[in-house]
């Protein structure tokens, strides 16, 4: 016995919300929806809603709006090893989170810890601090800052034209090209944790 709750409305809201937003920006929302590659990132507990109900609803409206091509399914998000529970007050409210941290911190952390499978994921505040401070800020942010600062101080903010490549340059280009291909493969396979 499955319960429908508000799933009929929810599926239609994906479409109507997207279309309303795009049309408020002067774009043809229906065309945008139907021309896009559609992903529905869902939790493992609502698989049947997306694979059965969503499909049936779209077919019932004569396929006027295309179905998602991909439905990556993830595990549950835990907080400090326990299941989120709004009724017990064991959750992180998005508004409260965003008062303390930039949205990019949440995007980075969740992408970094979420594998492309249905195993549960644990949001741990200590791990969040380590990954944000040591990876995002100290490694990625510092690298970008140093590269841009160097370019600004040595070349007035303009990357100079190269004169010729030596063997070391060619080796670096080969390594960067291979790394780019690996990252693209991970991203195309929704393995954002590995891409990072």
What is the predicted role of each segment?
Residues 126, 158-184:
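Acidic, turn-prone loop/beta-hairpin segments
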Residues 1-153, 189, 194-195:
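Structured secondary-structure scaffolds
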